[in-house]
């Protein structure tokens, strides 16, 4: 409860900001030390209970008719840190030159909500390749897929970026009979009518014959041309569909591989729209990093980082649940109005709601002590009996 309030009012992953937001009648250092100890010493069983309660709430708000799960990796840039546990070397994807810096990897999976397709995180793990118990990045990817399976309890559509162009992902999704759409690397080779060719070569030799228009969140409209063809993975000889998208980038067309059955041009357009919904997880990451200063967290152990990340994930999940009710709850309109955002319309409301809550809570000067059920013990004074 303290962490959730601290995140909402402080708007930051810095423990000092959360402690300041609690506004307790003790020295700030004492509050900071207590919060840091809570992150470091959180019992594993208690952690599971907290996460299970969150997932039980999430299940009420996801799209159960056609569950759509989006998987992606991110990073935490700790360029100037030296003393953190198992500090790794990662590629800073947000930098213009994609430089290698000190930091950590983050594996994330979100499910889309049932009303307005808000991204609700159901798996988020910070890890280092230098940890003793590290096996492989695919281990975390498969764990994230299994987490989605446990929640939806049936088949779902998985959306994956280029980093997941891997036969282990194809094999697992096929084995479990899940649908998938994976963006392919340019170096991927497939069999076309029995001949091995790179997808880049095939994309250059074809022309888009199916037109579609896409309006992004920045109100910029793109006219795309699509093409598709049957293709086979050389190692398993299974047939899939390669969808090629022209017009998103001036450099190269986008190549998507899917096991979803395509029978008409409407099916092709649907595949592309499903994949383009992947940007919602990008908005989720952006909200984490910009609104809550995610990369600036200053706890030293991976256990503390993951516990703080879990609390932030739960916080963002409840914001997504709020946003999913935007058409039926006046409270959410009031929160967004309080954010004083320049844009009155958007698709993912995470940033506006986060800023709105922070703006409203800045008028609270008592913290949350009076709402907490704290046991007050009677002072036991020793007395001398004559």
Question: Where are the regions that the model predicts?
Answer:
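Short, basic interhelical loop/turn and adjoining N-cap
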Residues: 21-34
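A short structural micro-motif
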Residues: 24, 41-42, 294
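Amphipathic repeat-derived elements
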Residues: 31-38, 144, 278
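Short alpha-helical "recognition helix" segments of helix-turn-helix
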Residues: 18
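Active-site-proximal, Lys/Arg-enriched surface segment
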Residues: 4-5, 34-116, 227-231
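Short acidic/histidine-centered micro-motifs embedded in hydrophobic/aromatic stretches
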Residues: 21, 38, 287, 291
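Single, function-defining residue in the core of a domain
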Residues: 1-14, 50, 65, 82, ...
